[in-house]
Amino acid sequence: MITIEKALKHMAWSNQEIFNEISKMPQGIYSLRAAEGEWPVGKIMNHFVNAAEWFQFLLTGKELSDLPRITNHEILLQMKLKIGEVDQVLIAEFSKPDEEITFTGDDGNQHKTTRAMVLTQAIMHTAEHKGQLSTILKASGHQLDLDKYDLWSYESQNQ
């Protein structure tokens, strides 16, 4: 059976690969969006990092950073390093016992979850937004082939 640890390692690898690939596209891609009112590419890329920091906060208590908006390749590559660091923290969290975590949500209420749930959500969350990102880029004439970053590709490159 695949473990959450392997899924986290795949997530971290694919995050790095996708940040690299985006950095090779034209600078203007950061303002592309699926439709009026939807998030542009730059905001989605920021959301990968912000969300990773949120999951890290839930598990470790480390406060969130004041991250710059991703509007160009230079900032994207800085944030690639940041998400790489946070992804390593999430991978390390897998080795700890699953336990209940209590946190205050955006609604001001106390919520309960578990370490396994937070780690699983981190994995699923990135997958969801990678699909969104790929669709925006394809609709705008750019190609982000997510099959290049699937679990089989990860396995073949990390044996």
What are these regions (language model features)?
Residues E5-N20, K24-R69, D107-Q159:
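Short, contiguous alpha-helical
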Residues G61-P97:
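Helix-adjacent hinge/juxtasegments
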Residues F94-G108:
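Acidic catalytic patch
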